[in-house]
Amino acid sequence: LLVFYLNSQFVLAQERFEPIKVSEDNFIIDGLLDEEAWQNETLVTIENEISPGNNTAARVETRGLITYTDTHLFIGFHALDNPKNIRASIRPRDNFSLWSDDVVLVRLDPYADGRNNYIIVVNPLGSHFDVRSVNAIEEDDRYDISFNMEFETAGQLVSDGYQVEIKIPFSSLPFPNGKDQLWHFNFFRKYFDNGNEIELSSQTFDRDNSCEVCQTTDQLVLKDIVIEKRFELLPYIAGNFSGKRAQAQAPFDFDKLNPNAGLGVNLDLNKTSTLEITMNPDFSQVEADVTQIDINSSYALEYPERRPFLIEEPMWLILLMVLSILVQSIIP
């Protein structure tokens, strides 16, 4: 009886949202929710304070809006507050110091299975980062920061707070095959009150449940969407040569140019299967524009993994490496 009661509470916590599909011509992503298409769209209120309050009523108003077209999901936020209290700076993408700003956040679980959340975080000026969240025991294992998807954001301060717009192509997200979709999602907001960090959610949050991704359960119904298959061609060409001086004042004597080239292909067979081929991949690629300071460090600097072939599904690569080692051990 107790188990049935708890399950009933879980089911009742779900809400179902069925936004109306609109024309993409009605949207300009400028950070202002002034387009006519937003006026009658599905409203999602962020009314639960989950920290420091424990599912208490939010003390500020936050409106989330959601709609979609054949090929894109559109999300809007209107976060009400005194503009003087809002913290925001223009930051590069995937700069996690963004978390020290006021932010709004959307979690998407396209498979509705509580295994993955695809998260987009945006501050009042439109700066953003994205991350994939999984169910893991250790905090450091819960977030895959190498995950990147295509999307567009914009944000602006307004007289009663700030507004944010997000445009997400369906082609950038994994989800089950089919034109009609049932996803799980929720919205989140973080702001500051007298220096204290306040967190709000569109759903209640169970602190005793260690599975955060399992608590993204509001239902989002999408009908008759267009599934665009992704095709990416990633060629590269590089070369190097070296030289030396025979004597201190002599000119450099250079060797011949050593050219190198390779190709990567990424093709969606359908929404659940992807064919990825690489020939002579450029394993020297790193995100070298990441700012890091090295002063008398006893360890080398590390850069985040950005090579497409290695971040699509790293677990498959680990499995292949393990199988390769086993085969070599069995068949010397």
Question: Where do the language-model regions lie?
Answer:
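Bacterial Sec-dependent N-terminal signal peptides
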Residues: L1-F17
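Structural preference for beta-rich elements and adjacent junctions enriched in aromatics
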Residues: A13-P332
